[in-house]
C-alpha cells in the first residue's frame, strides 16, 4: 500500500466561497497545513496554492487548486505528473452531498460520484486515488443542490463537519505511513459526539 505523499483539497477560490460547503476539502488541507506548520504559497505554474512539509517523518505535498471546482484537474493533473506522484499516493479531500454533516469516509478508487471536481480529475489520472469524503448533506431536491453546496452551513451543521474533519486530521499519520486500511477503519468508524 502506497504512502500518501500528495494531499489535495477541492474547493473554489475567493473569500466569497471560503465558508461554503463546497470548500470542505479546502478546510481539511488548510487545517492540516496549520497542524504541521506547512506554509501554503501561491503556485501559478500549477494554478493553485501548494506547500511541502514533514508529516510524521514523511515528505508530503499539499495542493489547493485555484481553478474553480469543475476545472480542478487543470491543477491536480500537471502537479502530480510533474512531481511523479502515482494516483495510489494521492488523497483528495472533497465535500460529499450523499452523506450527512458529521459523517466522514475514506474511500479508495471508484468513479466521480457526480462530484464536478472529481469529474475533471478521474479521466486524466484514473480512479485509483484515495478520497476523503466530507459529508455536507443533501438539500432534498436536485434543483437545490447548487445553492446548497455554494451556501454556508448553519452553525449546528458546521460544528458537525468540523468535528469530522478534526477526527480525520488525527489519522493522517496513518495515511502518510501507508497504513490506509487502518486509517479507513478508524476514519469510517467516526460518530459525531
From Swiss-Prot:
<comment type="subunit">
    <text>Monomer.</text>
</comment>
<keyword id="KW-0694">RNA-binding</keyword>
<keyword id="KW-0378">Hydrolase</keyword>
<dbReference type="InterPro" id="IPR036416">
    <property type="entry name" value="Pept_tRNA_hydro_sf"/>
</dbReference>
<dbReference type="GO" id="GO:0000049">
    <property type="term" value="F:tRNA binding"/>
</dbReference>
<keyword id="KW-0963">Cytoplasm</keyword>
<keyword id="KW-0820">tRNA-binding</keyword>
<dbReference type="GO" id="GO:0005737">
    <property type="term" value="C:cytoplasm"/>
</dbReference>
<comment type="similarity">
    <text>Belongs to the PTH family.</text>
</comment>
<feature type="site" description="Discriminates between blocked and unblocked aminoacyl-tRNA">
    <location>
        <position position="12"/>
    </location>
</feature>
<feature type="binding site">
    <location>
        <position position="68"/>
    </location>
    <ligand>
        <name>tRNA</name>
    </ligand>
</feature>
<dbReference type="Pfam" id="PF01195">
    <property type="entry name" value="Pept_tRNA_hydro"/>
</dbReference>
<dbReference type="GO" id="GO:0006515">
    <property type="term" value="P:protein quality control for misfolded or incompletely synthesized proteins"/>
</dbReference>
<dbReference type="GO" id="GO:0004045">
    <property type="term" value="F:peptidyl-tRNA hydrolase activity"/>
</dbReference>
<dbReference type="InterPro" id="IPR018171">
    <property type="entry name" value="Pept_tRNA_hydro_CS"/>
</dbReference>
<protein>
    <recommendedName>
        <fullName>Peptidyl-tRNA hydrolase</fullName>
        <ecNumber>3.1.1.29</ecNumber>
    </recommendedName>
</protein>
<feature type="binding site">
    <location>
        <position position="116"/>
    </location>
    <ligand>
        <name>tRNA</name>
    </ligand>
</feature>
<comment type="function">
    <text>Catalyzes the release of premature peptidyl moieties from peptidyl-tRNA molecules trapped in stalled 50S ribosomal subunits, and thus maintains levels of free tRNAs and 50S ribosomes.</text>
</comment>
<feature type="binding site">
    <location>
        <position position="17"/>
    </location>
    <ligand>
        <name>tRNA</name>
    </ligand>
</feature>
<dbReference type="GO" id="GO:0072344">
    <property type="term" value="P:rescue of stalled ribosome"/>
</dbReference>
<feature type="binding site">
    <location>
        <position position="70"/>
    </location>
    <ligand>
        <name>tRNA</name>
    </ligand>
</feature>
<comment type="function">
    <text>Hydrolyzes ribosome-free peptidyl-tRNAs (with 1 or more amino acids incorporated), which drop off the ribosome during protein synthesis, or as a result of ribosome stalling.</text>
</comment>
<feature type="site" description="Stabilizes the basic form of H active site to accept a proton">
    <location>
        <position position="95"/>
    </location>
</feature>
<dbReference type="InterPro" id="IPR001328">
    <property type="entry name" value="Pept_tRNA_hydro"/>
</dbReference>
<feature type="active site" description="Proton acceptor">
    <location>
        <position position="22"/>
    </location>
</feature>
Amino acid at each position: 500500500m502506497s504512502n500518501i505523499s500528495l494531499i489535495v483539497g477541492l474547493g473554489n477560490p475567493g473569500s466569497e466561497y471560503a465558508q461554503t460547503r463546497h470548500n470542505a476539502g479546502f478546510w481539511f488541507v488548510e487545517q492540516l497545513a496549520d497542524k504541521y506548520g506547512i506554509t501554503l504559497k501561491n503556485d501559478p505554474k500549477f494554478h493553485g496554492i501548494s506547500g511541502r512539509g514533514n508529516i510524521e517523518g514523511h515528505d508530503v505535498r499539499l495542493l489547493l487548486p485555484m481553478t474553480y471546482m469543475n476545472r480542478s484537474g487543470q491543477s491536480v493533473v500537471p502537479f502530480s505528473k510533474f512531481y511523479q506522484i502515482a494516483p495510489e499516493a494521492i488523497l483528495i479531500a472533497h465535500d460529499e452531498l450523499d452523506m450527512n454533516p458529521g459523517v466522514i469516509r475514506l474511500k479508495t478508487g471508484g468513479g466521480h460520484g457526480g462530484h464536478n471536481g472529481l469529474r475533471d480529475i478521474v479521466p486524466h489520472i484514473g480512479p485509483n486515488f484515495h478520497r476523503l469524503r466530507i459529508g455536507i448533506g443533501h438539500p432534498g431536491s436536485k434543483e437545490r443542490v447548487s445553492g446548497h453546496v455554494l451556501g454556508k452551513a448553519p452553525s449546528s451543521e458546521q460544528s458537525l463537519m468540523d468535528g469530522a474533519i478534526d477526527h480525520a486530521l488525527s489519522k493522517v499519520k496513518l495515511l502518510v505511513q501507508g497504513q490506509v486500511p487502518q486509517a479507513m477503519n478508524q476514519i469510517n468508524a467516526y460518530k459525531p459526539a
